[in-house]
Amino acid sequence: MADVKKVVLAYSGGLDTSVILKWLQDTYNCEVVTFTADLGQGEEVEPARAKAQALGVKEIFIDDLREEFVRDFVFPMFRANTVYEGEYLLGTSIARPLIAKRLIEIANATGADAISHGATGKGNDQVRFELGAYALKPGVKVIAPWREWDLLSREKLMDYAEKHGIPIERHGKKKSPYSMDANLLHISYEGGVLEDTWTEHEEDMWRWTKSPEAAPDVPTYVELTYRGGDIVAIDGVERTPAQVLGELNRMGGENGIGRLDIVENRYVGMKSRGCYETPGGTIMLKARRAIESITLDREVAHLKDELMPRYASLIYNGYWWSPERLMLQQMIDASQTSVNGVVRLKLYKGNVIVVGRKSDDSLFDASIATFEEDGGAYNQADAAGFIKLNALRMRIAASKGRNTLK
């Protein structure tokens, strides 16, 4: 262990990472630098400073990354209308490359030769953190305690904390039975009763959203203004990216929007059930499809849809910093120059309903699409030749006896 002199630890201040901090100090006999990120998880991050100081940490980084998170990670991802396996909006996945980036930046700034994280050896996060770290700093050493130590239960972690004088909270507050992760895009729940795929989640599990049954009986209308594929204003009031997502979370949560219960395929090979609340993201996805429906060329839109599952898998599996993701991002971003305008939505009891869309860059031409007299804008007789030419290969096949009729 003598080759490790200084480690940057992704530190939440909770039991797991506090034990990891002390374990790193004792096992590697090294200096530990802590990094705590505010990604909009809704918890105080400053208490992590006092806990780190109590464990002898001299260099402590606590960073408000909310704007960077939404501007440089969430918004670019949503430009692709990204969904993993048809449902998951990648709330956890998209936060990991930013944390990895900041870990490496701090390692470079402090002269650390290693980084460490609290992800377990069973999940996707270990892959996401480490792929990002190696992409940004090829020679960095990564220490993953959950793959090295024998503290494989909460009871063992508690015993270790008590033995080594690590401050832990014992204020009688009922601990959630779920493993949770939160940021400005979503909150996730795993474990507990959710490990039985037949058992319904409990209503009191949800923290951000009302149940659709308890949502207001009167719908909420909202207008979202897009510029270059990103939301820049809500109801005509300009907002920063983090403010946009925060306000949509509030509106969506109030109207019972954004709950999800799925079984997903983890990159490490197992299936895992998770429940998610993504109110703002659910609204953004619906609105983006609406504004693109009038501003994107048909073939561009279809190509984006074809490539989206690949793009989603790259993010889910931890390849945000890979050359293929960066290549796809350039193509996606190039498609967004005309994605400008306003989408009007009705939010009602778990539903996001598009009720209007307009744009100065719209490709929708009412004079051509009308069911009424179009004044010669579209010659319906032209359709006969179009159909015959497109049927040519099938007509030839049928003439050779290859039709499907018996």
UniProtKB/Swiss-Prot annotation:
Binding positions (ATP): A10, Y11, S12, G13, G14, L15, D16, T17, S18, A37, G118
Pathway where this protein functions: Amino-acid biosynthesis; L-arginine biosynthesis; L-arginine from L-ornithine and carbamoyl phosphate: step 2/3
Main localization of the protein described in the UniProt heading: cytoplasm
Reaction equation(s) it catalyzes: L-citrulline + L-aspartate + ATP = 2-(N(omega)-L-arginino)succinate + AMP + diphosphate + H(+)
Sites where the protein binds L-citrulline: Y88, S93, N124, R128, S179, S188, E264, Y276
Iron-sulfur found in the keyword field: no
Domain of life from the UniProt record: Bacteria
Protein's name in the database: Argininosuccinate synthase
EC top class, as a word: ligase
